[in-house]
Every structure is written in structure tokens, then in C-alpha cells.
Amino acid sequence: MARSGFTETGHGRIAWTETEGEGPAVLFIHGNSSAREMFGRQFESEIGRRYRLIAFDLPGHGESSDAPDPAATYSIHGFADAAIAFLDARGISQAVVVGWSLGGHVALELLARWPGTVAAWITGTPPAGGADMQVAFLPSENMGLTFKDQFTEEEARSQAQAGAGEGVPLEPWMLAAAMRADGRFRPLMLQAAIEGKDLDGRKIAGTAPQPLAVVTGGAEPFVNNEFLTSVTYRNLWDGKVHVLDGLGHAPFWQDAPRFNALLSRFLDEVTR
């Protein structure tokens, strides 16, 4: 069973869903122009029965409100501020953080900034600094949409399909989430990155003492998997980058059983 609600923060009204598992808290953070429903196949699994899984819609996404101050919120750093505000408002003092794509960059900031971060897991996310951007990502047509302010329905469909995976049937809410996202956040997020407002993900990966799991699809269309293995990590879980053969940008949706088995082992180990 899961329950949903809304929490007021200085970054807007945050929509969330959580399971009734009695184990430690696990915070899930979705990607660019997506929504918390992306993690449904984890919430409905045995993991959701054993752990308190919490997913929220980033400001300007899903059922959350748009940010009242877009310049303060619509960046990786600002989304991390919003996540911390949400956790504080909910009275959550410790959590494992699981981030996908943009959410993975937010998870890295939490790893560095929020004392309650027990461990972090990133998927579809290169732990990159500003100087790494040209090599951390693969060139693709959809990368051009990442920072575009407004989507046509065709562009929203393309963005949602690329996120879900080639050949993966799109759920209606995936397209709706891409259409709903506050388009102001995309160029503002790019501007913040250019201005150096976000923390250096590569530096975080190399210095954070908490366990960091790095998991990627073997057919990842956006992230350069060779870059992932070139990064120096201080505490890389399992001592390696996990590559899930044949899967794309959202392996947790595309092949939930395979993904969940790995996530379950990670959670069991880092919360002992």
C-alpha cells in the first residue's frame, strides 16, 4: 500500500507518494520533465513493502506547483534545496537517495550537502563537473530538448520516449508529465550550470565517504558509459559501475525485476 499527499515548502507545494514499509527511508528523485510515477515498479515491488519508499515531484513537475521563485529553484542546486526543504518539512532526518537522470545530479548534491544522506544511487547520471560535459554525455537529437523552454506535443512525446527507452510503450502519464513541466526550468537550469551554481559531481563522487552506486543501461542513449568508468570514486558500491546489458536510460522501468534485485541488495547492505 502507498499513500500520497502534499507538503508546503519555500519552493512550492510538493506532491509526494510513500509506501508503508517499516524499514529505513529511501528518497526517489525523477528526471527532467518526468514525474514520480516513473518509480511505480519499485514502489509496487517487495522493496516497497520492506522499506519506506518516498518519491516526490520536483517543483514545476507532475502534481507539484511551479516554483514561486524560478531563479532560486530551477537548477540542480535549487532542486537539491527543494529536496532538503521537503525532507525537513516531513521530519525525515535520514534517507538513502536514489536519483535518475536529472534526479541523479540532485542526489549527488544531497550526498555532499545533506547530513542525513546514508548512501546514494544514480542511474542515467554521469557524475560530471563543468569541464566534463562534452565527454560525459553522448550527442543525440533529444539532448537538444533537454534545455528547450517549450515543448510541442511531438517534442514531448520524443522526450518521454527517449527517457522510457526505445521500443518501450509510453504510458499516458509519461506524455502528460513532459507536457506539464514548467518549461522555464530547462533554460534556467542550463544557465545555472554555465554560471557554476551547481556543485561539481565528479568532485563529489571522488570525496564523499558514503556509498555511491552507479548503475547504467548498456544501451544508454544519453550518458557516455566510458566516462562513468573513468571517474575516480571514493566509495563506489561493489567497486564497479554496474552496466545492465540491453537496457536504456530508465532500466528501473524497462526491466524492473533485474533492476530491483540489484537495488534490493544495495539497500540491504547500506542500511545494515
What is the meaning of each model-derived region?
Residues 1-28, 48-51, 92-93, 240, ...:
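Alpha/beta-hydrolase fold catalytic core
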Residues 105-108, 112-150:
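Flexible "cap/lid" loop of the alpha/beta hydrolase fold
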Residues 10, 54-98, 261:
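Active-site loop/oxyanion-hole signature of alpha/beta-hydrolase fold enzymes
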